[in-house]
Amino acid sequence: EAVIINPIQKKTAAFAIFVDSTTNARIGKAILDYRNAVEYDGLSAYIIADNWRSPDEIKAVIIRLYKAMPPLEGVVFIGDIPIPMIRDAQHLTSAFKMDQERYNFQRSSIPSDRFYDDFDLKFDFLKQDTTDHLLFYYSLRADCPQKIEREIYSARIFPSVKNDSKYILIEKYLKRVVNQKRETNRLDNVMTFTGHGYHSEALDAWNNNLTALREQFPSLSEPGGRLTNLSHGMSKNMKDIVLGELQKPELDLAIFHAHGDYDTQYLIGYPPAENINDNVDAIKLFVRSKMRDARDRKKSIDEVKSYYQSAYNLPDTWFAGAFDDSISCADSLYSANLDLYSCDVTKLAPQAEVVIFDECFNGCFIKPDYVAGTYIFGNGTTVAGIANTVNVKQDIWSDEFLGLLSY
């Protein structure tokens, strides 16, 4: 049976905290403290706990609260809340295009809480996932608006771990939020990073980025303010530089414009060759990786080798050592130093309270060790991550209205 805790404060707008019954039973005090902090911020806050059986169940409650007084303006989902997996809606994404008939449901569907916060979108229920009981598949109906215009905002507090440690992580996070809401900390320290492989290759495309950020955050130009703008081409050791910046105590906001995967932030790519030997080494590294890839995919290694030899007239010696343990290890370490992985973030204490991941898949919360989650539930001070569950174009206006954070 659902547990509903009504607001204490009468405000002009409301906020709803949805939580599963087990999480509420385990860390109920932390959730109550979080509710009180939200109300201190100026919102009437509900707590609704239940053994939720479907997304439709939750959406019905959301719409009811939206029509009540004071009207609902936003929701947060804590713990094991059903996850809508949307199909037949790829035209609403900027870059996610996948054959729904060729690939399985989980891979070709989009985890999206637009199911909950855009009331005009209509869906037909398809099925519940057989391996992950939190996933529910829906098809977007053709007779509803084919654009996203949300009535409310929404967010998730959802660690990627499956064992009981998730309750500890959620509790620690909620305590962090409560403590930060008691502090006065204006946004006057920002780091931006632009990765390799898209329009950041053209520096003219970022010519006015610093100007825009200083207009959005005037405090960056005041004494004590700081704006650090990093580009992938500045250093071959960019990973160490980014890691160092992320751990500076004064950092308030970090913005990443780069390629990504659910557990990876792609930073610099392979650096350009400076001489002939660099070019040869780069080709050797490339063909060794292709041979290992063929082995891992159970394809013919000889066919792959033959293809690259005939296509690029490469000698046998350039393929040597592909499966040698020491060379494989060296290649792996070299590649690992180019990018930022979830396992790197877990060793850090990221200090930015807000991180924007303008990168593919970083917010895919159905995956283990998804990047945004490692920041949120890590050892630092991050309380908000804005990320994508699927791939996304990097030439969209990802920081529109960002200046609102300065108020």
Placement of each model-derived feature along the sequence:
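Cysteine-dependent hydrolase recognition
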Residues: 1-407
